Amino acid sequence: MAKRIIYNENARRALEKGIDILAESVAVTLGPKGRNVVLEKKFGAPQIINDGVTIAKEIELEDHIENTGVALIRQAASKTNDAAGDGTTTATVLAHAMVKAGLRNVAAGANAITLKKGIDKASDFLVSKIKEQAKPIADSNAIAQVGTISAGNDEEVGKMIADAMDKVGKEGVISLEEGKSMETELEVTEGMRFDKGYISPYFATDTERMEAVLDEPYILLTDKKIGLVQDLVPVLEQIARTGKPLMIIAEDIEKEALATLVVNRLRGVLNVAAVKAPGFGDRRKAMLEDMAVLTNGQLITEDAGLKLENAKLEMLGTARRVTINKDTTTIVAEGNEAAVGARCEQIKKQMDETDSTYDKEKLQERLAKLAGGVAVVKVGAATETEMKDKKLRLEDAINATKAAVEEGIVPGGGTTLAHLAPSLEEWANGNLSGEELIGANIVAAALTAPLMRIAENAGANGAVVAENVKSRAISEGYNAATGDYVDMLAAGIVDPAKVTRSGLQNAASIAGMVLTTECIVADLPEKKDAAPAGGGMGGGDFDY
């Protein structure tokens, strides 16, 4: 395909145009008075949402060059979402502000590479400052505050997430399900999550989220490699007669057997999914035994004289629900509390007996997975559109609370970044010079962008609010919900330090990359062939 090549200022301006479009679409959702965005869907009802990264993923522009700008800034949102699970809109607004100011300087003749060095140094300085300011989470009240802010000021959701964390512990897992009623409910069940995803993406049952969800499946556990499909045939025939799904956890499944499973899954003969067993060596075997206890099944291992081809239905485990994505598997089982309790006691004894710190750590991990359980939040709403929006908000809230537990909290509402701007300017003036100093000042100027946008979305003057906040004490900021200046920590308006840090780092990284762009190579739009001429009427000198 023919390519279009654009250089220098033209290239950067085209990128900027795409970045402007995406940033504006996402920024309208920022803050307690941020608005929603409607996404048109080719199939099904339109989606009304308030989630930055979801909006960013939907935007595709007709112009290939502008679309490259959209893709670059989308990366800042996606990376922040992957690292912290929230703060995607803030990352987009920050990246946009840095790019706009940086491009002005590059157009005026500044060296883009030196500017980028200044931006990177400023970013490192700010990350260390955010770590200094972060306060550890003291109690479930602080967790509830983080959840409330991330869920769009929904106190009920914040409290529910705090309760869930109390019940399953910091090591436990909180997952989301679509509920059957209007109310959002919390349900805590025994369960286990491990870091292995499906072997083949063809096992996914939900293609939009790329997840395999199996309800009430049988679970086949084995510590051997499954190479031949003949080994599986007897058990597959027994499962097919029951009409229930099957989940296979094995050391590995080789090509022939895997191909057979995939074909059966795609043809609808058997709803099956397969994952590799977690861990290595003896530890893998121990984890498989944990799963056998949890699911009330048997580990099919030759050490116990059991062979795969002789496996019976009663040897398989069962679960209420299994959710598998590309990286993780969550097994929610119930009704086997006594056996699980006995297994936990056994692991605790092993922990007491071992002197190795590493072994203790791994045993603690197994204990948390076995005893921690899974809290399921059942999302309730009046309509499907509202449910999808609520689910995305809850997902953000759960991720934000986990991030807060990891790295602590800082004053929210864009306050922390705005207060860091004067510190950065002071540090940069003392430590940097020339164009590196200009790069750092670009970051300093961009730090107030999220606060200004939050204020503007609430109908206030962003520049005035930003100056007022900078002149106040470090924990004081602007409460956009009420229009007052308050102590943010006391008012419960807090952000996880990890979310603020990730957003800033990713924004600085993308801004640096855009500024140092000198040439874009993109596809030329394909010319559509003109419609062929119609046939003549015949009999005359001309075709009409």
Swiss-Prot record:
Together with its co-chaperonin GroES, plays an essential role in assisting protein folding. The GroEL-GroES system forms a nano-cage that allows encapsulation of the non-native substrate proteins and provides a physical environment optimized to promote and accelerate protein folding. Forms a cylinder of 14 subunits composed of two heptameric rings stacked back-to-back. Interacts with the co-chaperonin GroES. It comes from Parasynechococcus marenigrum (strain WH8102). NCBIfam families: GroEL, PRK00013.1, PRK12849.1, PRK12850.1, PRK12851.1. It is an enzyme of class 5 (isomerase). Belongs to the chaperonin (HSP60) family. It is found in: Cytoplasm. The lineage of its organism: Bacteria, Bacillati, Cyanobacteriota, Cyanophyceae, Synechococcales. Its EC number is 5.6.1.7. This is Chaperonin GroEL 1.
